[in-house]
Curated annotation (Swiss-Prot):
PANTHER family documented for this protein: GLUCOSE INHIBITED DIVISION PROTEIN A, METHYLENETETRAHYDROFOLATE--TRNA-(URACIL-5-)-METHYLTRANSFERASE TRMFO
Species of origin: Acetivibrio thermocellus (strain ATCC 27405 / DSM 1237 / JCM 9322 / NBRC 103400 / NCIMB 10682 / NRRL B-4536 / VPI 7372) (Clostridium thermocellum)
GO CC terms: cytosol
The family this protein is said to belong to: Belongs to the MnmG family. TrmFO subfamily.
Lineage: Bacteria, Bacillati, Bacillota, Clostridia, Eubacteriales
Subcellular location: Cytoplasm
Protein name according to UniProt: Methylenetetrahydrofolate--tRNA-(uracil-5-)-methyltransferase TrmFO
Keywords associated with the record: Cytoplasm, FAD, Flavoprotein, Methyltransferase, NAD, NADP, Transferase, tRNA processing
Catalytic activity: uridine(54) in tRNA + (6R)-5,10-methylene-5,6,7,8-tetrahydrofolate + NADH + H(+) = 5-methyluridine(54) in tRNA + (6S)-5,6,7,8-tetrahydrofolate + NAD(+); uridine(54) in tRNA + (6R)-5,10-methylene-5,6,7,8-tetrahydrofolate + NADPH + H(+) = 5-methyluridine(54) in tRNA + (6S)-5,6,7,8-tetrahydrofolate + NADP(+)
Residues noted as binding FAD in the record, renumbered to the chain: G9, A10, G11, L12, A13, G14
Length: 436
């Protein structure tokens, strides 16, 4: 009998899965192809690399992803432990210093005596034992082909985009200003205001800018949560002003008025030396990014630490293939976790790794699997990806809409969400005593 569990991929989901298995006293072989081989979007040698934004989104219980974070904390998540420790200012959101975060996860994984890290590319599934596939949206070519043949349902393809990062010292703070919307919270964001003329010049250059060639990009299939800014701009001249460039609740101290549009920059590291352009995921050519984004007031001399990039995202038809424990229905010794399952977002990916890891451990120990209830965020997400009634499966962030509803006579949405969250945490605490 194999005395360990295989986990393929040391991203957010894979690290969380390995951690959950190891803390239950079971040996893990964690396979990671870095640093021998990198995907088009990965650059760091460390685990759990954040390739898009450095924000894990809201930390508030009134928001579903805030609830999901708290549920994961209850279940002793390594990802939440490291994210909380590597936090940088971001208002009500949980943003992290991506380098410190990745280093912390890597150190904890490597220090765990139950986890053996193997730096090799896996080209096909192991023939024996329990395996968790957490290879992410950029699964390597050979393994992608093997998995496509193995699951028999084929793959769905789309593309994600990452936003540029600029240095703080290159931002003209005589034009830009720090402020929170409506004066709420701390002034964590840098705001670059635009008048109507500046915005229209910027918009025109953006929609006509030259795009980078993307291999196999033969049709525009994008996920709303990570849509390229130029794609959004092409939907209409005012789309950006009602999206990531909305000016509401902000007053330009130089004019005393609300700007026509505002580009926001969010702190990207602990030192505050780097800021990412919020909502500016892009597939423009790099020289075009420099030219067009320097039209933004305050960024005329911006130094780009990282340009935006476009990369492939691959995921399986989970409702057909998986059950609510992320186990492959036709092969109960195989689990999937992370974005390859169609969950969307850093926290969601890690949560799927948590569920897969817990259940792989239960299988290994000969115990019943854990199906988390739809009344919890972590359970609602696992039920969504395994809902066989879904005919046109698309990636999904966690939200209160997929959770089991209760008859709450509360009209205020935030209060209703908060009560839903409190009920979810109460229910989950009953599971913690059993399965943590």
């Amino acid at each position: 009998m194999i005395d360990y569990i295989n986990v393929i991929g040391a991203g957010l989901a894979g690290c969380e899965a390995a951690w959950q298995i190891a803390k239950r006293g079971i040996k893990v072989k964690l396979f990671e192809m870095k640093p021998k081989k990198f995907s088009p979007a990965h650059h760091m040698e460390t685990f759990a690399e954040l390739v898009c934004s450095n924000s894990l989104r809201s930390n508030q219980l009134e928001n579903a992803v805030g609830l999901l974070k708290e549920e994961m904390r209850l279940l002793n998540s390594i990802i939440m432990k490291c994210a909380d420790a590597a936090q940088v200012p971001a208002g009500g959101a949980l943003a992290v210093d991506r380098t410190k975060f990745s280093q912390m996860v890597t150190e904890l994984i490597k220090q765990n005596e139950n986890i053996e890290v193997i730096n090799e590319e896996v080209r096909e599934l192991p023939k024996e034992g329990i395996t968790i596939v957490a290879t992410g949206p950029l699964t390597s070519g050979d393994l992608s082909k093997h998995l496509a043949d193995f699951v028999g349902e084929g793959y769905l393809h789309f593309f994600d985009a990452a936003a540029p990062i600029v240095t703080f010292e290159s931002i003209d703070m005589n034009k830009a200003f720090k402020a929170a919307r409506y004066g709420r919270g701390t002034d964590d964001y840098i705001n670059c205001p635009m008048n109507k003329e500046e915005y229209e010049i910027f918009w025109n250059e953006l929609v006509n800018a030259e795009l980078a060639e993307v291999k196999d990009f033969d049709r525009e299939v994008v996920f709303e949560g990570c849509m390229p800014v130029e794609t959004m701009a092409k939907r209409g001249k005012d789309t950006l002003r009602f999206g990531p460039l909305k000016p509401v609740g902000l007053v330009d101290p130089n004019t005393g008025k609300e700007p026509y549009a505002v580009v926001q920059l969010r702190q990207d590291n602990s030192e505050g030396t780097m800021y990412n352009m919020v909502g500016f995921q892009t597939r423009l050519k790099w020289p075009e990014q420099k030219r067009v984004f320097r039209l933004i007031p305050g960024l005329e001399n911006a130094e780009f630490v990282r340009y935006g990039v476009m990369h492939r995202n691959t995921f399986i038809n989970s409702p057909v293939l998986l059950d609510a424990t992320y186990c492959l229905k036709k092969s109960p010794n195989i689990y999937f976790a992370g974005q390859i399952t169609g969950v969307e977002g850093y926290v969601e990916s890690a949560s799927s790794g948590m569920v897969a890891g817990i259940n792989a451990a239960m299988d290994f120990l000969g115990k019943d699997r854990v199906v988390f209830p739809k009344s919890t965020a972590i359970g609602a997400l696992s039920h969504y990806v395994s809902d066989s009634s879904i005919k046109n499966f698309q990636p999904m962030n966690v939200n209160f809409g997929i959770m089991e509803s209760f008859p709450l006579k509360i009209r205020d949405k935030r209060k209703r969400n908060y009560e839903t969250a409190m009920r979810a945490l109460k229910i989950l605490k009953e599971y913690v005593s059993k399965y943590s």
